[in-house]
Every structure is written in structure tokens, then in C-alpha cells.
């Protein structure tokens, strides 16, 4: 199978960056297909640490990297990220990076709106305040400015006028000053020669790449449980994060995603607000957060931590068509005498094995746990199955049984090479 799609199978922060970086050795092209610069990836290569939030992880490997049409792009942030990587010795030019010419732009007015709404809200969603949601609103409302619009000053000016006709009343209602249209036009005109060299019809490139027999790695951002349709709505992101979006967000078509690899932590974390059935507000939760270094790459916020939720991951396996999972951060569980796995939930007087759609029901769920004996030995840095303690192997096998998908890869540290390969997704 030529293509692999990597998605987070929980609430994000599962370790996708490291796995995409590791898998990109086997790929020819890496593609981002949704989200914006609201979800960060941390890559550790030797003694160098790279923090990305918009660029595909493949750029660090020198692989052709494509930002697809499903991504909303802050062009100023993109240039800053390119500059930062350049200072770390990774040179990125149009020969290495392609930006879909039909991708929509995040503008400063989107950030303003995002932050003002969150500040005014009684029930906060926990947005990063980077303008992703408002940018998607304008995309769906057919008033967004797209990369290709930077070619045409006259059309760009008209589009800005139309955009401000919508945003001005919103800004007024939130106590924000009117946005300066001519100033925005001048900013975008100055930006155009820096961005347009990267702009190309990504769908056409991908069609040619696949026909030539090259391997494509699709890189998802965030996690399936933050999907705008299938996640814990309204505590979700503003895009579809499930594997099916790889086709729509790249333009390659429904056969494009290929093998779907779900990235799953050996426990559960979540950033921001929203239901979290297995959350631990005790010493074990603190242990997971401290040992796992559970702080957001983009926001620096502490992540909420809890036991592994097999019911949620099982649901994610079904929603995404996951063929195999990559289990990460197993080493964080080292030394815990007892481990728990959530196998389902109690809701009132009945037991269910899935997360219901209603927010009220989600908040009333009581997890049903299965206990397992932990291990005292270290798993950190293990690079083969035989290096794992017997109880760690039992834990992994039980997860496979409960979620209905095999473990294809096992990550035992942030280092790229501390990865146990059970089956190669590109060969499956």
C-alpha cells in the first residue's frame, strides 16, 4: 500500500509529530490536510528539538511537504516558522514546501475575533486564540481570502471590502474598533511576493505524484475526538480531524488516504474544557502529567490526565477506519503498581460502550474500569519487543483486544529511534 494517513485517535497531543517524523523516512511526500497553527508538534532529532505548528513534519527530513487546501494558513506565522527552522539549519524553499493555492488565509482580524469571543464567553471552549475558528467560518461563508487571491490586487481589494462588511458589525458588538481595510490590503500586498513562490495547485501535484508510484504520508493535526462532527461538541476544533478529511483536505480523492494509523497514548490527556470520563485529579494524575511532561506545545497549558479509555479509542477506530495504532508514552506508566483501563461507561442504570453525542450524557458518564498489574522495570528507550517487561506486554495486548486494532508501532521515548516496529504501515 503506497499511502499512509496518520491521525490522533484521542484528544490530540498523542505524539503524532515524532511518528510522522519517523515514518517520513519511508515516505516521499508529507501532506497536512486540516487545521491551522493551533496544534503543535515537537520533534526530537539527536540533540536538536524542533517545534512545528503549521509546517508538515516532513520538512525536517528534507521531504517534499505540502500544506493542503483543508488547512487555514496564517501566512505571517508560516514565514516565521520557516525562518525559525532556517536558524536551526533546515533550509525551506519552494522546492521543498508547497502551499495549496486554494487554501484560505487566517488574517489578524480572525485572531481579534477569536480572542474577543473567548474573553467574553461565560462557558469557554478553550480556544488557542489564533483565529482558526473564525477563518473556517469565513471559508464556509464564502467570503475568505485564499492564497490565489494574492495574485490579483483589484480582486483582493473587493474581497477585503466584502470581508469587512461581515466583520465590522461583529467587531462593533464585541467592543473592537473597525478594521482598517486599506492597511490590510497593504499588508497583503507586501506579503504576496514572499508567499506566492510556494503556491501551486496541490491537488494536481498529488495526482501526478501518486500516478508516479510515490509514497504519500498524510499528517493529521489534533485528534479525532476533537472533530467538529464526531467529537465532544461544542468542545471541539473547527475542522474535521478524522481520516476521511485527508481526501477532501488534499484534493487527492477518497482512495488517497490508504492505511490509516491511529496515534494513541498509553493513557489519556486533554487540553482545555470538555468532558473527560477517566480524568484523574489525584496523585496518579499528577504523576502522568509530570513524568509525561504534559504541557501544550503551542499554548504551554497543562494537560488534564487520566487512565486509558478503550471505549473512546474503540469509537475512534470505527470512525477513522484505523488499520493499526502507534502506542506512545508507554514509559510514563513505568513504576505504577496498578493500572486501570476504561472498558465502557455507566449512564444511569445502563452500561454503554461508546461516547454518546449529547453533552449532558457525556458529563454524566461513570467509567467502568478493568485493573491490571503494573511493572517496576523501565520501558524507556526500548527498541525491541523482547526488551519490554512481561506486564507491559500484557497491557499492550489487552489494549489491542479492547479497541479491536493491532499495535503497529510502539514509542518508548521522544527520541526518533526509540520506536518498536511491529508492522510497517507502508507495506501492509
Curated annotation (Swiss-Prot):
Binding residues annotated for substrate, in chain numbering: 297-303
One GO CC term, this protein: cytoplasm
Location (main, coarse): cytoplasm
Chain sites annotated for binding Mg(2+): 13, 40
One GO-annotated biological process of the protein: IMP metabolic process
Keyword Membrane: no
Catalysed conversion reaction: IMP + L-aspartate + GTP = N(6)-(1,2-dicarboxyethyl)-AMP + GDP + phosphate + 2 H(+)
Keywords: Cytoplasm, GTP-binding, Ligase, Magnesium, Metal-binding, Nucleotide-binding, Purine biosynthesis
Signal peptide coordinates: none
GO molecular function, one term: adenylosuccinate synthase activity
Active-site residues per Swiss-Prot or TrEMBL entry: 13 (proton acceptor), 41 (proton donor)
Domain of life: Bacteria
Cofactor annotation remark: Binds 1 Mg(2+) ion per subunit.
Pathway: Purine metabolism; AMP biosynthesis via de novo pathway; AMP from IMP: step 1/2
Amino-acid positions noted as binding IMP in the UniProt annotation, renumbered to this chain: 13-16, 38-41, 128, 142, 222, 237, 301
Pfam families to which the protein is assigned, alphabetical: Adenylsucc_synt (PF00709)
Entry keyword Ligase: yes
Cofactor(s) this protein requires: Mg(2+)
Binding site for GTP: 12-18, 40-42, 303, 329-331, 411-413
Family annotation (InterPro entries): Adenylosuccin_syn_GTP-bd (IPR018220), Adenylosuccin_syn_Lys_AS (IPR033128), Adenylosuccinate_synth_dom1 (IPR042109), Adenylosuccinate_synth_dom2 (IPR042110), Adenylosuccinate_synth_dom3 (IPR042111), Adenylosuccinate_synthetase (IPR001114), P-loop_NTPase (IPR027417)
Coiled coil (UniProt feature): none
Enzyme Commission number: 6.3.4.4
CDD domains from the UniProt entry: AdSS
Subunit structure of this chain's protein: Homodimer.
Protein name: Adenylosuccinate synthetase
